[in-house]
Amino acid sequence: MPAREPAKIATALATLAGERGDGLIVPPDPATNTHRKQIVDLAANHRLPAIYGLRSATVEGGLMSYGVDISDLFRKAAVYADRILKGEKPGELPVQFPTKFELVINLKAAAALDIAVPPTLLAIADEVIE
């Protein structure tokens, strides 16, 4: 359900909840990041379990996130910026892809949704918010 504006986000989540959707996957893009607090709150209000692509949504109350470690990406970008400032040509630098991903689980959100997170999932999480 693509929705990029606040009113459409609210409508989309209400529709999903009304259709008894089992859950929500929120991709890590600029629109969802801009409106992440609204999405987190609406998902909680509609009792929709959601997995987010950015850690920040889980920190703000979302159930869980799995995605690229943003800090690691910024470190890599800084190295590239340094190389360019030292004279290397940007077009000659190899393309790099994310290599570090993180799983963050919010147990408070899980409890509010009456979800028991399996111990095996907790064991592999990079961060557990209690």
What residue spans do the PLM features occupy?
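Short hydrophobic alpha-helices and adjacent helix-cap/hinge residues
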Residues: 1-130
